[in-house]
Amino acid sequence: MKFATVTAVLLMIIVCVLLPKLPAIHTWAVEREEERIAEAELAEQKITMSDLTIKNTEVADDTEQRQLRLKLPAGVKGSDITISNDYVTQTVRIELPQTEVSYFENDPLTGSSNHIDNLSYAVSKGSSGLIEITMDQVYELDMDYDENYYYFDFLTPHEVYDKVVVVDAGHGGRAPGATKQGINEKDIDLGIVLQLKAIFDNSDENIGVYYTRTDDSNPTFDQRVQLANKSQADLFISIHNNSTKSGRMSSTHGTQVMYSESDTKELGSKAFAQICLDHVTEALESRDKG
């Protein structure tokens, strides 16, 4: 399935960019306000973490530099552990049951820390342990375990997929975007992205697709951009539904695609933006707004 075909049926207001150069998709005022709101939301969810060290080993090549081994706590099986990978923040969370503070004091992690920006742990009152690993970029996890250890290999997206795409649903959380008659832009943006996700999820193409949000959250502007940069994305697509500056009802309507003017390659942002615009206006029978 071609990128243009996948996106054409769904996108109304989009920003299409070929990495690594991204355009300013919001005014600075909007960026700063939404970032302030997002940071406030993150602060409310903050967990007190303590620093965790890693027992470094000598590595022979770059692949081995992205490997870790975790010693299992006494009485805990590999199947008891819950692992999540937050691509937006590049954070891997490892949840371990029946874990005391002393477990973390004995260097349970062995491997290379070259690809790690931060490593910390926390223990709840119910003796449930949490390890948070903040990576230097987006990685896919290849995991396995035996009776004593859990093994992690960290693979770059391009080691797993032929092409990498980042899709951004605009606004979210306490930042509603454009509003009219009780309808928030953030909900429309997300609805379009979830429809697009359903198509990608059922595609036979080996395309890795990362989403800045799939719920009513509000990643910071920097997190949205860094997801694209740190996944070395081939395409960045941002979904927005605009309104008039006054917010009043208007006869102005249609589809518009923004792109990076600095990307002058023959098959660069402008070419992809034109493909999107042509297909979307045809599919939606909407007015071409450039």
Residue ranges of predicted features:
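Short hydrophobic segments within beta-strands
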Residues: 168-170, 212
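Generic anion/oxyanion-binding catalytic loop in active/binding sites
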Residues: 77, 178, 217
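Short linear recognition/processing motifs and adjacent strand/loop elements at protein termini
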Residues: 1-166, 173-174, 192, 198, ...
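Glycine-rich N-terminal loop/short-helix segment of MobA-like nucleotidyltransferase
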Residues: 171-181
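Active-site-proximal helix/loop segments of hydrolytic enzymes
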Residues: 94, 183, 187-290
